[in-house]
């Protein structure tokens, strides 16, 4: 899906810059200046899709009242390990782990839902945990955290052997998921920010849906409709 989207963007004259870091967005005469490691460019409109805390860091000119409004939305962090196994753990795609002693809350075996030959014969197993950024797991060294995860995996699946692991990756994100509280619909941020030409379209606006690819596309379509751009871009 991402490759196809990239092809379509390029075909319509868009430019995708991978591994670029946006340091600041600020209003200037004629539009918005976007400063990156490579320099500065001016655009008439900017659509911001990362997390709300990153918006607050990147756009210093946001009004104090708007900053306070967005700062009331709490976030959870996430840590994920992906094991490339030579054998399957179970016949199930998704297992929620409710044991309070478990270091992870989900075991996801993707190939039980969809087998992709691009995995090179390996079976990817996702071990995921949502947590507060001040939880010890978030700053724990990866080897120690890996040992905690694998030890508990052996308890859940006694037939599992560590020799099955042919690849291993670890990732974490401080702002992985906004926490939706009571009466959130009354406080859900709009797409338009107080800065002219700057729009926000991110997970805080997917409510009342849950996080997911389909709903992120729906959210983008709603923004394009609000801007009057959907018909032009889909023509």
What does each model-found stretch correspond to?
Residues 20-125, 130-139, 143, 148-160, ...:
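Mid-domain catalytic core of redox enzymes
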Residues 9-23:
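A conserved beta-strand/loop element that lines the FAD pocket in flavoprotein oxidoreductases
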Residues 8, 15, 54, 61, ...:
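Active-site catalytic microenvironments for nucleophilic, acid-base chemistry
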Residues 18-20, 26, 169-174:
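A general secondary-structure junction signal
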Residues 110, 114-235:
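Conserved flavin/dinucleotide-binding core of flavoenzymes
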Residues 16-18, 48, 200:
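A structural signal for the hydrophobic beta-strands that form the central parallel beta-sheet
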Residues 1-12, 130-132:
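Helix-loop-beta segment of a Rossmann-like dinucleotide-binding subdomain
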């Amino acid at each position: 899906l991402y490759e196809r989207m990239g092809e379509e963007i390029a075909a319509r004259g868009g430019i995708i810059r991978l591994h670029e870091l946006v340091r600041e967005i600020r209003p200037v005469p004629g539009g918005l200046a976007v400063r990156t490691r490579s320099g500065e460019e001016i655009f008439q409109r900017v659509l911001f899709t990362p997390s709300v805390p990153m918006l607050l860091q990147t756009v210093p000119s946001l009004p104090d009242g708007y900053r306070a409004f967005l700062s009331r939305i709490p976030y959870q962090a996430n840590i994920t390990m992906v094991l490339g196994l030579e054998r399957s753990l179970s016949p199930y795609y998704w297992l929620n782990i409710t044991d309070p002693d478990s270091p992870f809350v989900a075991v996801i075996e993707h190939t039980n839902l969809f087998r992709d030959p691009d995995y090179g014969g390996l079976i990817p197993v996702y071990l995921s945990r949502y947590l507060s950024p001040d939880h010890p797991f978030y700053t724990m060294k990866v080897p120690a955290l890996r040992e905690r995860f694998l030890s508990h995996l052996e308890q859940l699946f006694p037939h599992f052997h560590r020799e099955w692991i042919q690849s291993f990756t670890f990732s974490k994100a401080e702002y992985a998921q906004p926490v939706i509280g009571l009466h959130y619909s009354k406080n859900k941020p709009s797409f338009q920010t107080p800065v002219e030409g700057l729009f926000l379209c991110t997970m805080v606006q997917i409510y009342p849906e849950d996080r997911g690819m389909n709903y992120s596309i729906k959210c983008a379509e709603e923004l394009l409709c609000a801007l009057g751009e959907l018909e032009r871009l889909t023509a």
